[in-house]
């Protein structure tokens, strides 16, 4: 493990993070010690720790060392897809799409059998297209990824379940709640029956299912699902995580739906603080998720008759939406602007 220690210390990685990288190699019985692979592994560790900028830096170092020695082609794709995913996490969507497309082009031009790397890139583009409101493009890419995974693994596989999950999220945004719920339930069934130890996947799917259930007016079931997801997440995470923030926000929407505004306000504020804790680790102080919480807090104050507090939060939200939203038709963004104009 000396080569890992020396390599990472040489680029300024702190001792505690080097230890985590070494632990990852040991847990996975990984004996590939070329520079590209080491930096890719370090990037994964920083990503898991919520440090997106440091993760991006490690992926860039991995890519920069591609032609300095021996490397596996999979490490090339991993580093480029990794850079793309970090740019995506940091909100630099155009750069992310270029990176994802470069992976797709190489794989297709060379007729390579790197289906997992191809699917990862397709999913990345689909996700960004969804964020931008390009729903037809998102649906096309998700279905392409689903077709590849079904051919590779069959329907009842974790990789297929992941794509079904994303399709559920897309159909939710398209207000096709029946399809959304069907996809979430199918995904959840696969996870629970085939992969019961995949707690994050289970909890994540439950939280998204709750969102669609509330849209159908099933507030009691939605509240139950959101709380179930938080209970599972709390078994996994010891630090603030955006998945927990999402479920807290979801509980806020249930109480808002019920006109229980004091409870809604409490949950939206909890969600806001959790999101802030998450994104500040990557020095990201403005984010769409934070803006959405600010908007919801402003909305609840307005519904409660507190116009002064409402205006303060709505103005903060609007400013952040303007600097972070890539979809001008986003529902929260448009609603926030309308309240301020009225």
From Swiss-Prot:
It holds the Pfam family ANAPC5. TPR repeats lie at residues 36-69, 77-110, 119-152, 161-194, 203-236, 245-278, 291-324. It comes from the Viruses. It comes from Acanthamoeba polyphaga mimivirus (APMV). Keywords: Repeat, TPR repeat. This is Putative TPR repeat-containing protein R856. InterPro entries: Apc5_dom (IPR026000), TPR-like_helical_dom_sf (IPR011990), TPR_rpt (IPR019734).
């Amino acid at each position: 493990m000396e080569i890992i220690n020396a390599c990472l210390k040489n680029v300024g990685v702190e001792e505690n993070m080097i230890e985590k990288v070494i632990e990852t190699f040991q847990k996975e019985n990984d004996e590939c010690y070329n520079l590209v692979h080491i930096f890719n592994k370090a990037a994964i560790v920083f990503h898991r720790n919520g440090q997106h900028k440091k993760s991006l830096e490690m992926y860039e170092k991995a890519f920069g060392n591609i032609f300095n020695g021996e490397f596996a082609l999979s490490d090339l794709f991993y580093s480029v897809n990794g850079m793309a995913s970090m740019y995506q996490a940091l909100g630099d969507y155009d750069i992310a799409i270029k990176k994802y497309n470069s992976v797709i082009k190489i794989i297709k031009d060379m007729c390579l059998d790197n289906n997992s790397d191809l699917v990862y890139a397709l999913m990345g583009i689909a996700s960004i297209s969804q964020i931008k409101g390009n729903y037809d493009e998102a649906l096309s890419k998700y279905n392409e990824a689903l077709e590849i995974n079904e051919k590779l693994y069959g329907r009842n596989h974790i990789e297929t379940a992941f794509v079904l999950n994303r399709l559920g999220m897309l159909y939710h945004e398209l207000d096709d709640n029946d399809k959304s719920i069907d996809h979430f339930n199918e995904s959840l069934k696969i996870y629970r029956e085939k992969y019961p130890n995949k707690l994050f996947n289970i909890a994540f799917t439950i939280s998204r299912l709750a969102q669609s259930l509330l849209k159908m007016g099933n507030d009691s079931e939605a509240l139950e699902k959101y709380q179930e997801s938080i209970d599972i997440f709390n078994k996994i995470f010891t630090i603030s995580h955006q998945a927990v923030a999402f479920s807290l926000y979801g509980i806020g929407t249930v109480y808002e739906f019920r006109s229980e505004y004091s409870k809604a306000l409490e949950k939206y504020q909890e969600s806001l603080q959790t999101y802030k804790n998450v994104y500040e680790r990557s020095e990201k102080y403005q984010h769409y998720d934070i803006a959405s919480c600010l908007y919801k807090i402003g909305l609840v104050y307005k519904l409660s008759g507190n116009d002064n507090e409402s205006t303060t939060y709505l103005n903060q939200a609007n400013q952040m939406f303007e600097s972070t939203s890539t979809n001008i038709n986003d529902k929260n963004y448009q609603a926030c602007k309308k309240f301020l104009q009225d």
